[in-house]
Amino acid sequence: MGVTVIPRLLGLKDEKKIATTVGEARLSGINYRHPDSALVSYPVAAAAPLGRLPAGNYRIAIVGGGAGGIAALYELGRLAATLPAGSGIDVQIYEADPDSFLHDRPGIKAIKVRGLKAGRVSAALVHNGDPASGDTIYEVGAMRFPEIAGLTWHYASAAFGDAAPIKVFPNPGKVPTEFVFGNRVDRYVGSDPKDWEDPDSPTLKVLGVVAGGLVGNPQGENVAMYPIANVDPAKIAAILNAATPPADALERIQTKYWPEFIAQYDGLTLGAAVREIVTVAFEKGTLPPVDGVLDVDESISYYVELFGRFGFGTGGFKPLYNISLVEMMRLILWDYSNEYTLPVTENVEFIRNLFLKAQNVGAGKLVVQVRQERVANACHSGTASARAQLLSYDSHNAVHSEAYDFVILAVPHDQLTPIVSRSGFEHAASQNLGDAGLGLETHTYNQVYPPLLLSDSSPAANARIVTAIGQLHMARSSKVFATVKTAALDQPWVPQWRGEPIKAVVSDSGLAASYVVPSPIVEDGQAPEYSSLLASYTWEDDSTRLRHDFGLYPQNPATETGTADGMYRTMVNRAYRYVKYAGASNAQPWWFYQLLAEARTADRFVFDWTTNKTAGGFKLDMTGDHHQSNLCFRYHTHALAASLDNRFFIASDSYSHLGGWLEGAFMSALNAVAGLIVRANRGDVSALSTEARPLVIGLRPVVKVPAAELATSQ
């Protein structure tokens, strides 16, 4: 559910071979290194168990059954298999959501527009009265998977096998698409001018200008306006994705070039960068005046807003214009051409399969118990070798307290903040923890230390990580779905482009991006009878503007106070507008309004992440936020200071530099487990595999490592 940024989406349609299996996609992203951690390829680090644990029996908790938590479980399973006889790992997974796949029970799938969940990976099964034979699936979270997401495909390979088939996701621009912005209407597929209805479209021109200004050229002349180490970002992306780049080049990117770029541009918004690029292009004459009527300033603003709605062809970034250029550059450097769908009916199956594989690879030495409990507080408690403590409430609000050797907190930042902030930031002789403000029973702990312990003596150091987590920006996001007959696209009033009906719409109607996605539910090899109509996929302010129409949210089945039909009709109404197409003498009612109205009444559905318990869609850095995000990303390096005896680790896309993507959640899970291995081995990084060591020693430590412990951390 993250931000799709594909500068090459429209331009390189035929350059790269389309992957048809999980294994082919896995090879596409196996080498990629991110600029914040350029010294390590995460898929390579995860190719084998991350390291070894000392012999013994471990009791470990994972809080959260989403992608980060289950990936951490899988890695713990591989570690368990390496333990000697008589040793093992007992994992307790805390997951409060009754609809989680971890609590799968008869009846859940029978709920009309709700399905099983794996954290924010969730789907809604749509059926016409018979849940055993669904009509289509609404992929609420995690609906598409970039080819360069090497760790995602690594785990997909574990879950499904390399031979499992995959399909290209029908992104705007990959399928015939219509773009509507003010008086501007474009139909296109790809970015070759001959594949645009208007080869001289200002939309296509501003796309090329902004892509060049932000990305530049992979070879030849440097043209980007925001270079990294005086070269185009496209050239840096090529190094990061090379199979065998020079080690010194990667080190320079991570330790010099990328930090310099951050220092220079972390205070610059994406919107300001786009305006500067457009202004320079206009002054050079690359972009002409608009209609010869608007003056210079208004022409520049027109182009800035035009790109703001169009983006790189998959939907605009205007709602994200306040994010930092640094955050956008991370996504630009994550350079790819295609996104795919998985070989599943619903994407929750990916996480469920990985959960089952974790227990298989554990070779009988991994024991897993799932607890349907809500974790309210965490702390260290006890005298010497203080153990990690979790206080939780079950579905009847009975209080429970458990001690663990280690805890991985695998929940988004808005959920984590109250869990880790209640016990304060320094040692206390005794504390009463729990949700006393809700009138619930509490529990008394003695000799209490903060859960995210970074110092024995500095409350400010301990507060720093908690406040950093609390200040991360959570982007607002929402989706509105409906079900249509696939044959509806064959009606004569649905326009065609290049011999196919329009299947994606990007517009300023308030709906933002709209997709028609064929159902994964098919019979006897026939074409799917139904398709999911993602009527609206919005971010930030676009999402906020729709919220008053959502009725009973975040999930909107029919109720007495607000019906799904009433909610959906407001979406249809937004598309009722007059549009004038090229060559037409008059504006006519927009055909898309008619397609939206074709949807089945019973299956209209909205999911708004901001009003969901996750409190938002995905982490995204605003200007200045890099310093919070990066501290969270490096948090696991506290394990190098074994004498600190911190037993907590964090794992979520929120604590990565790829907020909203499974790849970010998986990366943070690897970080957490690598840190756990080092901590279990008293700071000895040689316990990690050679490939996994940069996960810890390749990053700047979040704590000062005492001189006596420094040798083992080298």
Curated annotation (Swiss-Prot):
Keywords: FAD, Flavoprotein, Monooxygenase, Nucleotide-binding, Oxidoreductase, Zymogen. It is an enzyme of class 1 (oxidoreductase). SUPFAM superfamilies: FAD/NAD(P)-binding domain (SSF51905). Its cofactor is FAD. This is Phenylalanine 2-monooxygenase precursor. InterPro entries: FAD/NAD-bd_sf. Changing R144K: Reduces catalytic activity 400-fold. Binds 2 FAD per tetramer. Heterotetramer composed of 2 alpha and 2 beta subunits. Belongs to the phenylalanine 2-monooxygenase family.
